[in-house]
């Protein structure tokens, strides 16, 4: 999979591709089942679903921490210029 953040010598992302300013929420990547669909899953499928959703939530949370840290660095650097 290619890097989704364009480098200076690359073209910007095309329609449907991500760029560094796109935001992602848990709801964007979560899989939701209706009660009827959930009832059709066996216990191992339900456990797999829970594990995948928990991992997705952890991944998004870690990205948020990195984003906040990087945003803070940019603010500090900007303030140092004054």
Curated annotation (Swiss-Prot):
<dbReference type="Pfam" id="PF01352">
    <property type="entry name" value="KRAB"/>
</dbReference>
<protein>
    <recommendedName>
        <fullName>Putative KRAB domain-containing protein ZNF788</fullName>
    </recommendedName>
</protein>
<feature type="domain" description="KRAB">
    <location>
        <begin position="24"/>
        <end position="82"/>
    </location>
</feature>
<dbReference type="GO" id="GO:0005634">
    <property type="term" value="C:nucleus"/>
</dbReference>
<dbReference type="InterPro" id="IPR001909">
    <property type="entry name" value="KRAB"/>
</dbReference>
<dbReference type="InterPro" id="IPR050169">
    <property type="entry name" value="Krueppel_C2H2_ZnF"/>
</dbReference>
<dbReference type="GO" id="GO:0006355">
    <property type="term" value="P:regulation of DNA-templated transcription"/>
</dbReference>
<dbReference type="InterPro" id="IPR036051">
    <property type="entry name" value="KRAB_dom_sf"/>
</dbReference>
<feature type="compositionally biased region" description="Polar residues">
    <location>
        <begin position="1"/>
        <end position="23"/>
    </location>
</feature>
<feature type="region of interest" description="Disordered">
    <location>
        <begin position="1"/>
        <end position="25"/>
    </location>
</feature>
């Amino acid at each position: 999979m290619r890097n989704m953040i364009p480098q200076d010598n690359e073209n910007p992302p095309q329609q449907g591709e991500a760029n560094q300013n796109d935001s992602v929420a848990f709801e964007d990547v979560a899989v939701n089942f209706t009660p009827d669909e959930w009832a059709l899953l066996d216990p191992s499928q339900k456990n797999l679903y829970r594990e995948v959703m928990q991992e997705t939530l952890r991944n998004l949370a870690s990205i948020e921490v990195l984003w906040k840290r990087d945003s803070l660095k940019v603010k500090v650097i900007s303030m140092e210029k004054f």
